[in-house]
């Protein structure tokens, strides 16, 4: 749904639905989207679409035309894509495979170009498009600074090749699309400082020169295009896990000239570590329910002196729980955003509220609810999927109406005109 006259859109990410082929994706969309839209008083309803590499290959001109006709018929529109997972994302062990192929590869580059081509076909006139993507690569894969520098270099070149493709799309089709790097724990870019360092050390100097040479531009013009077409996807769960202060992050990004193109509204698990061994046993029992085998659930521990310790996955962290002197753990597990507590565990919902409040001063056009873990939630947290998605929408809208007044009741108005 479009939330404001100036172009803010709210959706949920369809990566919550299993399905890698285009037929599976379309079947899910037809099952859930019209039913979900009917629960809201809105004429047009936005979609945050996740397409695997397989689906992008299958989604040819005829399929796109058929899909567009269905979207118009249903009052639906696509404005953002999730281009992070390339391959299978459900019903298999994903873990660190979600980072492959990474941004050093032609496969990732071509996949993202395919996504941009599809999104340009689907975008309504006058609506900007976004594609979120992985934070270049996965840090634990590399054991030397020289290896990492090579990854930064090749990733920069490949990102610029996509920017060239996007510039051409904008010039020839009138559709503006930006790629949004999505930092997360243990990603090659995992926090705001690393985002800024990547822009200042790699994207702007190396990428700017490469783009200027390719398009015969001045360095200033090339830098402007890079800043426009390479932005950041601020996932509230990810930034919370690494203990980032949203106020400081938004301020630092603005000062560095880095735009947040998309906000993924999601919550992580957080918990203070009790001193009593019996209480730690109870905590271990509660956390163990989230130590499932499909996705990585990175843990970041905070110590009294301010230092942080990162664990690759929750089972590894649980081995240290009895003896660790850390004061707090935060776990990368996207839990439903409408609850503040889960038994003795807490959520990082407060950071979502802070981010929503920041939108008054730092507008962002694309907001996407992203709780993709429904299938792997502990059984006691599972409810009817459609109802759960609706509750997340209701919570976001209610927070705005009660606290921020960014959108007032405008989400009810048919603001978007689809030809």
Where do the language-model regions lie?
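Hydrophobic faces of well-ordered beta-strands that scaffold small-molecule active sites
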Residues: 8-14, 43-49, 78-83, 129-133, ...
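N-terminal pre-domain/capping segments
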Residues: 1-121, 126, 226-229, 370, ...
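Active-site acidic/histidine proton-transfer and metal-coordination neighborhood
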Residues: 92-231
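Flexible glycine/acidic-rich beta-alpha junction loops that bind and position SAM and/or redox cofactors
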Residues: 85-94, 134, 138-141, 241-243, ...
């Amino acid at each position: 749904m479009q939330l404001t006259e100036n172009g803010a859109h709210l959706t949920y990410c369809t990566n919550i639905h299993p399905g890698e082929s285009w037929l599976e994706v379309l079947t899910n969309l037809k099952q859930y989207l019209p039913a979900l839209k009917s629960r809201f008083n809105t004429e047009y309803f936005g979609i945050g679409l996740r397409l695997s590499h397989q689906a992008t290959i299958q989604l040819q001109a005829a399929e796109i035309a058929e899909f567009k006709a269905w979207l118009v018929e249903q009052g639906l529109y696509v404005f953002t894509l999730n281009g992070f997972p390339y391959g299978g994302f459900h019903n298999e062990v994903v873990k660190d495979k979600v980072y492959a192929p990474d941004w050093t590869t032609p496969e990732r580059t071509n996949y993202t170009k395919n996504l941009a081509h599809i999104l340009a076909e689907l975008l309504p006139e006058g609506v900007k498009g976004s594609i979120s993507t992985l934070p270049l690569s996965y840090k634990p894969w590399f054991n030397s600074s020289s290896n990492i520098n090579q990854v930064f270099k090749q990733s920069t070149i490949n990102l610029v090749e996509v920017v060239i493709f996007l510039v051409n799309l904008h010039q020839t089709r009138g559709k503006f699309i930006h790629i949004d790097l999505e930092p997360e724990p243990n990603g090659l870019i995992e926090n705001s400082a690393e985002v800024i360092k990547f822009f200042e050390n790699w994207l702007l100097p190396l990428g700017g020169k490469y783009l200027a040479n390719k398009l015969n531009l001045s360095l200033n013009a090339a830098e402007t295009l890079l800043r426009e077409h390479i932005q950041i996807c601020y996932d509230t769960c990810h930034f919370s896990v690494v203990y980032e202060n949203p106020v400081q992050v938004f301020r630092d990004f603005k000062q560095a000239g880095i735009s947040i193109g998309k906000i993924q509204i999601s919550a992580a698990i957080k918990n203070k570590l009790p001193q009593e061994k019996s209480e730690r046993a109870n905590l271990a029992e509660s956390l163990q329910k989230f130590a499932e085998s499909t996705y990585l659930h990175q843990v970041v521990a905070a110590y009294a002196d301010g230092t942080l310790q990162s664990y690759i996955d929750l089972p590894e962290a649980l081995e240290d729980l009895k003896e660790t002197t850390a004061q707090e753990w935060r776990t990368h597990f996207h839990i439903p955003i409408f609850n503040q507590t889960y038994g003795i565990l807490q959520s990082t919902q407060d950071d979502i509220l802070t981010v929503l409040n920041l939108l008054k001063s730092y507008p962002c056009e694309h907001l996407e609810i992203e709780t993709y873990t429904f299938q792997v939630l502990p059984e006691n947290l599972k409810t009817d999927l459609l109802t759960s998605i609706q509750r997340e929408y209701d919570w976001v809208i209610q927070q705005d109406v009660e606290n921020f007044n960014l959108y007032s009741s405008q989400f009810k108005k048919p603001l978007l005109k689809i030809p």
